[in-house]
Every structure is written in C-alpha cells, then in structure tokens.
C-alpha cells in the first residue's frame, strides 16, 4: 500500500482506472460488436480492474510510493486517492506479473502513465489498461486435415526462446 512520506508537501493522485477488452480482435470471440470487431470471452479476474496490481513510482528517485491491489487501495467512495509528495511519478496497473512471460494461455493487460503532483493540488489521472500481448490463432483447412489424417503437430516459435508445440489433439 502507500509508503507515506508525503508530509507537508503533499498533493493527491485521484485515479480512474479502466480495462479495455471490448473491440479486441481475438479468436475466442464470444460475440460481434459494432464495426465488426469482436468481444473476447476473458475471465473476470483478467478484466476486473479491482483485481489489478497498482504501482506508483517516483520517477526522480525510482522509489515506489505505493503498491497494492486496486480493491485494497480504494477509499470508502470506491476511488483510488493517494497522498503523494510533490514530484514526478509513473503509475502502472496490470492484471498479473506478465511482463516477462514469453508464452501464456492468459491475456496480459497493462496500462502506464506519467504525471506530476503539486503541493495541495489533486491530480486526476485516467489510466487505461489494454491487451499488452499477442494472441495466436491456428486454423487448419479441411484439405490439410485430410492430407494429414494420421498425425501432425504445429510449432509456434516467437524467435525469442519460447516455443509451443500443438499436436493433433490440442488443435
């Protein structure tokens, strides 16, 4: 949670946080929405920002000023309002520690923004978390399936050391 230390030079961060997952073109689409894009069938834990981790870092000192689950950082009015010392900050929110994950079945949502805090002033920040990974969809034609009835596998390689092999039964 908040690390304190704002003291007499305190200002506040008032954060509005959202996750954009409608309109994401993905293969596990549950429905078609306006403009022909699709809406994914993401798990609630991945799209509900209350489950996200929020980190506020002082960009001048690189010290964390606050860290916690969004639901734990909200006040009685359901808003994230943090007292911070005057200075420059970065706020980051994400649904899980997916930054260095090379292959995952789970979507990774992340948002980042910088802002400044002035003494005695409330700084409003709108932070939007977006899909920060790539989803791969593999579709096989009927002619491929006919030609390779017995067995086959498909290898997906990200050229960064992560390889995933899908056999006939997992496609």
For the regions a protein language model found, what residue spans apply to each?
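Acidic Ser/Thr/Pro-rich low-complexity disordered segments
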Residues: 28-46, 60-66, 98-106
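Bacterial Sec-dependent N-terminal signal peptides
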Residues: 1-21
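Tryptophan-paired
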Residues: 40-92, 150-171
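Structural motif
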Residues: 17-47, 139-148
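Structured interaction patches on ligand/partner-binding surfaces of diverse proteins
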Residues: 3, 21, 70-76, 96-132
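Compositionally biased low-complexity segments at domain edges in trafficked proteins
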Residues: 122-157
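Residues that cap or initiate secondary-structure elements
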Residues: 21-23, 60, 88, 99, ...
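Residues at beta-strand starts and edge strands
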Residues: 9-13, 50, 78, 87, ...
């Amino acid at each position: 949670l908040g690390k304190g230390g704002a003291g007499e030079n305190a200002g506040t961060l008032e954060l509005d946080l959202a996750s954009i997952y409608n309109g994401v073109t993905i293969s596990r689409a549950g429905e078609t929405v306006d403009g022909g894009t699709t809406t994914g069938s993401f798990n609630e834990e991945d799209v509900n920002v209350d489950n996200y981790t929020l980190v506020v870092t002082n960009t001048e000192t690189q010290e964390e000023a606050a860290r916690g689950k969004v639901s734990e950082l909200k006040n009685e009015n359901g808003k994230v309002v943090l007292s911070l010392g005057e200075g420059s900050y970065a706020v980051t929110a994400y649904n899980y520690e997916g930054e260095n994950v090379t292959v995952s079945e789970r979507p990774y949502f992340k948002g980042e923004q910088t802002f400044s805090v002035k003494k005695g002033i409330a700084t409003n920040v709108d932070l939007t978390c977006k899909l920060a990974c790539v989803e791969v969809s593999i579709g096989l034609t009927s002619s491929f399936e006919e030609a390779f009835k017995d067995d086959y596998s498909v290898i997906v390689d990200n050229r960064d050391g992560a390889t995933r092999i899908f056999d006939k039964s997992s496609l």
